[in-house]
Amino acid sequence: VMSTIGHVKLARFLAKFQRDYHGVELEVSEASVQELKNRLEQGDLDLAVLNPLEGLGAAFRVHDLYSERYVVVFAPDHRLATLNAIKLVDLSQEPYVDRLSCEMRDLVMGACRERNVSLYARFRSEREDWIQSMVLARIGFAFMPEYSVTSPELLQRPLIEPAVARTVSLASVPGRPYSPATAAMVRAAQTFDWPG
């Protein structure tokens, strides 16, 4: 699983899968998109849940699971808390918490440059729990996928102008036969009521 995927939604799917398919053992590990691709190609993984940002090419079979918007998250007393949605230009000069493992980071930073939006990262981390804790501690705001926000204390507003979204997909290697458990997982993922 890509490390930026919201675990709550995925856990609901995995719980239903476990109820429907007793006896199937699951192992979940986190990695970057590149590492997941490598492990799939080498046969170390049967399936990967990831964002095929620029496509995975013919080397992979991809089943889209759901799409999610990027939101701006901040502490409840933040000056932007009264807004229903946030434009990128609203964030210029705001203290920022940088999600280093975000696969969409370059895209968002490019949109900032195009609009002359200046962000100063006061804190950087690859860990989603640290990012949310620092935002809650009022270090700054963060951009996050809407289903990855797990702290109920944080406020979140959709990012507009530009709106940014990602697709979360299930990837496998075409031509490689599925084990019965893997085939069951693929069928279950295709019929699950995502995002969960």
Q: Predicted regions: what is each one?
A:
Residues 23-27, 118-122, 167-169:
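Residues at or immediately flanking beta-strands
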Residues 9, 158-196:
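A late-sequence structural motif
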Residues 61-71, 142-146, 153-168:
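Short beta-strand->loop
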Residues 37-38, 63, 89, 132-133, ...:
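Alpha-helical segments flanking ligand/cofactor-binding loops in enzyme cores
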